[in-house]
């Protein structure tokens, strides 16, 4: 199919800009009725009123798409997922219903450790096949760019294997989503390094970072900076070393306790800090000053029955807030964009407009891609979502139900049915 596309009779709904929108800016959307969007070789070349040339047959080398007044949004950017893994952890859901916490399950050998074992047992082919199946479900909900993390290997071989699976999927023209790889070797402490976290950080720096740089396997380095996992100092040391190897810093921060991860993210100039359920006021203010994107994951708080991150407070403090699914096999086995919208609006007090910005332009900024995706503007990729309605407020209103009619990736059409 050609990557030349003309979309007409669309209701364009988009944030604007080539960087993250902060604070009050998040509520500002451009809305164009009866609009045309032109895509040439996968790149947007025109956004504006309907053109007579469409009727006159000027675009005879283009695919034509009549949006019939439906909303046309930027493709959704899911900037925090763990979609490459082996096994499943369905039994943990029942354990949590009986009162066990995420950390108590992890400490008794469940949680991440059980996924690590299952992932280490899978071949490249089986790991890739499982990941591709999850991606297909996610793209049907309008996701056109997704971040993926390693972190279920915790050894040299399997950490690299996860990253190579993502690279393989990214090169496959049949996969309808761009994948942004993140190295999360510091996701948990493996049994081989039990009670030796400093030695494990040394191992990651010595054995993995040079290979990841050499083979261009990741763009970011993430760390689970949390009490009982990796300390502030250990996180600082790894992320600083990763920067020397060309990887940009991200953090799982202040998810379980207010450890100071948000403050560390600001100190290091991290691209994003994620979770932030227990981020302090000082941490939020520091992130706002330094331009660290606050990536909030409402599906995880929902699944764990935890308090939601203070999205409203973060926006009011001037933060750039992004939303993501945190799809993973344990704490949140869901890639539901519709439910993410609903929970963010209901429990984090985001407006619908702010939530749209959070799942498009600010999600792109959390992946260092706001210059090329995340809004419908000339020069950006032709990644779009067509809703089933001319009213974008259905995004949270359809609680958990998919309201995406068609996903358009690089100018190519993919109906959601």
UniProtKB/Swiss-Prot annotation:
Q: Per its UniProt entry, what is the enzyme's top EC class, as one word?
A: hydrolase
* Primary localization class, coarse: cytoplasm
Q: Which GO terms describe its biological process?
A: L-histidine catabolic process to glutamate and formamide; L-histidine catabolic process to glutamate and formate
State its Enzyme Commission number(s): 3.5.2.7
- Positions annotated to bind 4-imidazolone-5-propanoate: 89, 152, 187, 255, 331
| A Pfam family it matches | Amidohydro_1
Q: Which residues bind Zn(2+)?
A: 80, 82, 252, 326
Any idea which positions bind N-formimidoyl-L-glutamate?
Answer: 152, 328, 330
Recorded hits in InterPro entries, A to Z, give: Amidohydro-rel (IPR006680), HutI (IPR005920), Metal-dep_hydrolase_composite (IPR011059), Metal_Hydrolase (IPR032466)
Give the keywords, sorted: Cytoplasm, Histidine metabolism, Hydrolase, Iron, Metal-binding, Zinc
Q: Which GO terms describe its molecular function?
A: imidazolonepropionase activity; iron ion binding; zinc ion binding
**Catalysed reaction, written as an equation:** 4-imidazolone-5-propanoate + H2O = N-formimidoyl-L-glutamate
Give GO cellular component annotations, separated by semicolons.
cytoplasm
Q: Where does Fe(3+) bind?
A: 80, 82, 252, 326
**Which cofactor does the UniProt annotation name?**
Zn(2+); Fe(3+)
| Pathway field | Amino-acid degradation; L-histidine degradation into L-glutamate; N-formimidoyl-L-glutamate from L-histidine: step 3/3
Q: How cofactor binds (record note)?
A: Binds 1 zinc or iron ion per subunit.
Give compartment(s).
Answer: Cytoplasm
Q: Which family does it belong to?
A: Belongs to the metallo-dependent hydrolases superfamily. HutI family.
Q: What does this protein do?
A: Catalyzes the hydrolytic cleavage of the carbon-nitrogen bond in imidazolone-5-propanoate to yield N-formimidoyl-L-glutamate. It is the third step in the universal histidine degradation pathway.
What is the protein named? Imidazolonepropionase
Q: Which species is listed as the source?
A: Bacteroides fragilis (strain ATCC 25285 / DSM 2151 / CCUG 4856 / JCM 11019 / LMG 10263 / NCTC 9343 / Onslow / VPI 2553 / EN-2)
């Amino acid at each position: 199919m050609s990557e030349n596309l003309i979309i007409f009779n669309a209701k364009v709904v988009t944030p604007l800009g080539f960087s993250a929108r902060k604070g009050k800016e998040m509520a500002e959307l451009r809305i164009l009725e009866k609009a045309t969007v032109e895509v040439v070789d996968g790149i947007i070349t025109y956004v504006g009123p309907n053109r007579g040339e469409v009727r006159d047959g000027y675009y005879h080398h283009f695919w034509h798409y009549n949006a019939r007044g439906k909303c046309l949004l930027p493709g959704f950017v899911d900037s925090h997922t763990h979609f490459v893994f082996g096994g499943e952890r369905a039994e943990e859901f029942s354990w949590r219903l009986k009162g066990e916490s995420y950390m108590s399950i992890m400490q008794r050998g469940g949680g991440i450790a059980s996924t690590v074992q299952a992932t280490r047992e899978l071949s490249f082919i089986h790991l890739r096949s499982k990941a591709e199946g999850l991606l297909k479900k996610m793209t049907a909900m309008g996701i056109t760019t997704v971040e993926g993390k390693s972190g279920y290997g915790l050894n040299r071989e399997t950490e690299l294997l996860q990253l190579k699976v993502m690279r393989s999927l990214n090169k496959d023209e049949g996969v309808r989503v761009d994948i942004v790889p993140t190295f999360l070797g510091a996701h948990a402490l493996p049994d081989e390094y039990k009670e030796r976290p400093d030695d494990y950080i040394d191992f990651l720096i010595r054995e993995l970072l040079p290979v990841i740089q050499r083979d261009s396997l990741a763009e970011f380095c993430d760390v689970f900076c949390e009490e009982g996992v990796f300390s502030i100092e250990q996180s600082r040391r790894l992320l600083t070393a990763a920067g020397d190897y060309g990887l940009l810093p991200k953090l799982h921060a202040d998810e379980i306790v207010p450890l100071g991860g948000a403050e560390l993210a600001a100190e290091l100039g991290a691209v994003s800090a994620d979770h932030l359920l227990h981020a302090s006021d000082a941490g939020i203010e520091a992130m706002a000053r330094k331009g660290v994107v606050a990536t909030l994951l409402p599906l995880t708080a929902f699944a764990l029955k935890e308090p939601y991150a203070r999205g409203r407070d973060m926006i009011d403090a001037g933060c750039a807030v992004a939303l993501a699914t945190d799809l993973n096999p344990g704490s949140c086995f869901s890639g539901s964009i519709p439910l993410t919208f609903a929970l963010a609006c209901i429990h984090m007090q985001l407006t619908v407009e702010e939530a749209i910005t959070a799942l498009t332009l600010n999600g792109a900024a959390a992946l260092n891609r706001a210059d090329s995706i995340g809004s419908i503007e000339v020069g950006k990729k032709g990644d779009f979502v067509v809703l089933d309605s001319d009213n974008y407020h259905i995004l949270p209103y359809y609680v958990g139900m998919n309201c995406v009619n068609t996903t358009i990736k690089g100018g190519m059409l993919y109906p959601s049915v």
